[in-house]
A protein has these predicted regions:
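Acidic, glycine-rich A-domain
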Residues: 1-171
Length: 171
């Protein structure tokens, strides 16, 4: 799964807020784009063209992480697998200029922390994050930072192996 915003500078969400006389503390002011690169039941061969979308120029814009994590979590909760792991690949902090220009500067960060805390403390789903070039441990209890995107594959395997090994030791 992937996520971004549909527009720079807010799009329809911002226009609607403007036309409603700009009420105070409006919350998110950008249109979301949630992307299913590969569904849980889709074979890798069927998804390979979709995976190439990650590299499409102009697709990725701003990041409203909390709502994206919530969306991914709700999809994962519906799955029938016994064990569920939500691995987040992050390039840093949630940022959306349209939203942050009219809400508190930590609005998106607070929301992300709230969502992650709920998953970590009250959910059967395990969540971990890999920050590319950024330390994301202020958002996620299980987090690792890498400096080079070329490390990503090996670190993903290593982190998953550690999770499986730690779970095995409990039984």
């Amino acid at each position: 799964l992937g996520f971004t915003t549909k527009n720079w500078k807010g799009g329809q969400s911002r226009e609607k807020w403007n036309s409603n006389n700009k009420p105070k503390t409006p919350g998110r002011l950008n249109d979301l784009r949630h992307i299913i690169y590969k569904g849980g039941d889709t074979h890798w061969r069927q998804a390979k063209n979709n995976l190439g979308l990650m590299l499409k120029e102009g697709l990725l814009k701003e990041n409203i992480d909390g709502e994206a994590i919530s969306w991914a979590y709700s999809r994962l909760r519906k799955r029938k697998e016994e064990r569920k792991i939500l691995m987040v690949i992050s390039d840093g902090a949630p940022v959306d200029d349209s939203t942050l220009s009219v809400n508190s500067g930590d609005f998106l960060e607070k929301h992300l922390k709230k969502i992650v805390k709920y998953i970590e403390e009250k959910s059967e789903i395990e969540i971990l994050a890999i920050g590319i070039g950024h330390d994301v441990s202020r958002y996620y209890d299980k987090a690792i930072k890498i400096t080079d995107v070329n490390e990503l594959g090996d670190v993903m395997i290593s982190q998953l192996s550690s999770l499986f090994e730690s779970k095995k030791n409990y039984h």
